[in-house]
Structure formats: structure tokens, C-alpha cells
Amino acid sequence: MQSPTAQGTNDGVLPARTWPSVLGALTDGRDLAVDDAKWAMDEIMSDNATSAQIAAFGVALKMKGETPEELRGLADSMLGHARKVPVDDDVVDIVGTGGDRSNTVNISTMASLVVAASGIRVVKHGNRAASSKSGGADVLEALGVKINLGPDEVARCVREVGIGFCFAPVFHPALRFAGAPRKEIGIPTVFNVLGPLTNPARPRAGLIGCAFPGLISVVAGVLAQRGNSALVVRGDDGLDELTTSTTSTVHIVADGSVTTRGFDPRDIGIARVSLDELRGGNADVNAAVARRLLAGETGPVRDAVLLNAAAAIAAFRGLGGRTLEDGLSDGLATAAQSIDSGAAGALLGRWAELTSGLASSK
């Protein structure tokens, strides 16, 4: 895959937006302008594209190498077709692309609870497991949270509890038109990385994990173009999180630019562990792990959750000239207090109770 910063020869929109012109540009190695990419996704979201066109588009884009402009056009189209969440953007998302095939516990979901209990509002966007045993939606259900809620109900959860969950099939119903072609071709394409960029609440900040090394800088580029504050991360062991088994690569997105650097958890006092110590099971197993964490259990899972919660807190607050290590150290203290005070466990209970009431009244 070519470098995400490589430039094709197409600096403007295509002379005519048709599938032959779009696919011809991609197979010739030419980049699409934002509006051309948006047109293609609009056609898909409107059920105006055939399965062959959708499959060809995903594969051709993958073979050429996606650019931030293309990914932004696709994501903007998806958001245009999504159901809107009536909250302001002063919220944070903690989400990964999935696809790392590590079968770890649900680190980002647990971190979301910790961050929300610290007083920072969270709107998480996710789905059921695709390549793992337990996705964010699966473990939340196992924890008693009702996930099939609409925009107004999610907004109420954010207002009253400090956290909400946007279940992707509810908020992106038009994406179903791409489902069959994606399943038939059976390889990861750009569709696999759009989730973290299409949160219907449009949060201004985020901790975004990307399992695909060729796309992490592209995702960061989109967030920079939007003016977001974010940390886009990939563990050097392949995790779509900040890992504690080795170092991680971090793209710091701030003020419209991206800075890339490495990070070693030992630099802020977190010991390295084996990846096996972070592995989980099905939704019920991972929910039990989450409950023990919220009850105060220490160990490798707590360290990984605290680290990722700290990163989300740092992304929300901004580094403000501090080093990444300083920002994460401050976030660690906040996250630890969120668990140790009982606030995170209490928040889960309130959230589950509220969503149960909202679901039963629908």
C-alpha cells in the first residue's frame, strides 16, 4: 500500500461522476478529491450502487492506497446519512477499528466507563464483534446496558449519566447496503476503518485505535482536517489500543496537525506484561472481568484500562505543550481515582438502570 501522503494526479473533481470514472481513476492510481469520494459513498448509502461496484470500489481503493481526503469524503457521506445525536460536541469517544484478532478483553469499553465517571462525557460508537469473541456492544449487553436506543435516548443517557452508546446498525441503517459485498470479498477494506470516524455525536476529542498500520496516519489526517483533538494509536504488538505488552505508535492530533512518536508504558511506571495476560473470552467472560475491575481488582487488565482511559482524558484536555508522558501521567491519576472511589462502578449501575427504563418504554 502506498504512503497515505502520496499524491495522485487528480487535484480536482472528476469531469463526470460515474462509477466508470471513479473506478478508472482508482485503478490508474489517481487519488479522488473529497467530493468524488463522497459521491461514491452517497451512491452506496442511497442503494444506487450494485454489489459489483461496491466491491470493486473497496478493493480498488485499497490497492491504490487511501488518502485522508478520500477517507474524509466517505466519512462525511456516512455522517450525512446517519441519525443525529442531539448533544453538543464537547464529548469524547474511545474506539478502535477492531480487526487486530487478539481476542483481548474489552479495554476501550471499560476505559469508557472510567472516563465517564471522571466527569468527562463519553459517547461511544460501536458494534457487535466481527473478528473477535466479544465486541463493545456485546459486552455492554452482558453488563446490563440496553444498546438498541435511538438518538434522543442516547442523548438523555449522556445528560443524566455522562455516557451513551450509539449502536452502529441503529445509527447507520444505510450501511446495510454494503454488507453483502463486504462479506463476499472477505478482506478488510476502507469500510473497516470508517466506524471510528463516523460517531453520530461528532465528538471533538477521541482515543482512536487502528489495527491497520497502513491506515493509522490516514485516520489521523482526517481528524486533523476536522480540527479534532485526538490520539490515534496502534500497539506495536498489533493491538488497536495502547498496549502494555510492548511499545505503541502514537499520532498526536492537535491544532490541525499530526505529530507521530513512539511510547513505552514503562516511561510512566506501567510494567510490561505478556499479551496473554490481556486476553479475554466471550461477552459474559469479559463482562465478569469488567465487574471485577470496577470492584477494585488490580493487575494487568487494570493497568491497560487505566492507560487507555488516561489517553482519552489527555486527548480531551489537550496536551497544551506538555509531553505525552506528562499528559498520560495526569490522566492516570484521574482514571485511578474514578475506579478506586467507586464512581465507575456506580456509573455502570445508573446507566444500565436508565437504559432498561428507556428500552421498556419504547
From Swiss-Prot:
EC class: transferase
Residues the record lists as binding Mg(2+) 1: S108, E241
InterPro entries (alphabetical): Anthranilate_Pribosyl_Tfrase, Glycosyl_Trfase_fam3, Glycosyl_Trfase_fam3_N_dom, Glycosyl_Trfase_fam3_N_dom_sf, Nuc_phospho_transferase
Record's cofactor remark: Binds 2 magnesium ions per monomer.
Binding positions (Mg(2+) 2): D240, E241
GO MF annotation: an example: magnesium ion binding
Swiss-Prot/TrEMBL catalytic activity: N-(5-phospho-beta-D-ribosyl)anthranilate + diphosphate = 5-phospho-alpha-D-ribose 1-diphosphate + anthranilate
GO terms under biological process: L-tryptophan biosynthetic process
Cofactor(s) demanded: Mg(2+)
Keywords: Amino-acid biosynthesis, Aromatic amino acid biosynthesis, Glycosyltransferase, Magnesium, Metal-binding, Transferase, Tryptophan biosynthesis
One Gene Ontology cellular component: cytosol
Pfam families: Glycos_trans_3N (PF02885), Glycos_transf_3 (PF00591)
Ligand binding (anthranilate 2): R182
Binding-site residues for anthranilate 1, renumbered to this chain: G96, N127
Protein's pathway: Amino-acid biosynthesis; L-tryptophan biosynthesis; L-tryptophan from chorismate: step 2/5
Enzyme Commission (EC) number: 2.4.2.18
List of residues binding 5-phospho-alpha-D-ribose 1-diphosphate: 96, 99-100, 104, 106-109, 124-132, 136
Biological role: Catalyzes the transfer of the phosphoribosyl group of 5-phosphorylribose-1-pyrophosphate (PRPP) to anthranilate to yield N-(5'-phosphoribosyl)-anthranilate (PRA).
Cited NCBIfam families: trpD (TIGR01245)
Record-stated family: Belongs to the anthranilate phosphoribosyltransferase family.
PANTHER family for the chain: ANTHRANILATE PHOSPHORIBOSYLTRANSFERASE (PTHR43285:SF2)
Quaternary data: Homodimer.
Name the record gives this protein: Anthranilate phosphoribosyltransferase
Organism per entry: Rhodococcus opacus (strain B4)
Source lineage: Bacteria, Bacillati, Actinomycetota, Actinomycetes, Mycobacteriales
Gene name for this UniProt entry: trpD
